[in-house]
Design a protein with these regions (language model features):
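Short alpha-helical segments that sit at the start of domains
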Residues: 1-24
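Short capping segments at the starts of secondary-structure elements
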Residues: 16-18, 30-35
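Non-DNA-binding regulatory cores of transcription-related proteins
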Residues: 64-141
């Protein structure tokens, strides 16, 4: 995954620096969406020195703009994008009980949302679709 992220970033004219690689690795180590603060703590721990939160925020903003990570808006958290070389809109299933977040790729559903917005005279720049409920495991309990 890191190689695809590096290729996507470099294809956009940006450099894959050691700090950017560390931020990506830290974010990839989380099983659930991680906040910028959590990523900062993980990078600081891995490097054995305090990394400035502002640096991590800037890198996460760059990664979001370049499709390397996606942001779960309601959680103000980030996930590594498994397909950084292919831009697509995401649908997130967010469990209100345990916090797990599943990423779905359903271009037809998102295109339908875009079409409905266009019919209403609205130009969508970046759709953010999140469905909140309970995951399969939490439903079983």
């Amino acid at each position: 995954m890191a190689l695809a992220a590096q290729q996507a970033l470099e294809a956009s004219g940006e450099q894959w620096t050691p700090l950017r690689a560390s931020v990506f690795a830290a974010l990839a180590s989380f099983e659930a969406p991680a906040s910028a603060y959590e990523v900062t703590e993980a990078v600081s721990s891995a490097q054995g020195r305090r990394v400035l939160a502002n640096s991590v925020y800037r890198i996460l903003d760059l990664f979001t703009a370049k499709n390397i990570v996606t942001r779960v808006e309601s959680q103000n958290a980030f996930l590594v994008n498994a397909h950084p070389l292919h831009r697509h809109d995401c649908i997130f299933l967010v469990c209100e009980n345990c916090g797990t977040t599943q990423h779905l790729d359903d271009d037809a559903a998102v295109e339908h949302v875009r079409a409905v917005a266009k019919t209403a005279g609205f130009a969508v720049d970046r759709p953010v679709i999140e469905l909140h409920g309970r995951c399969h495991d939490c439903q079983a309990h």
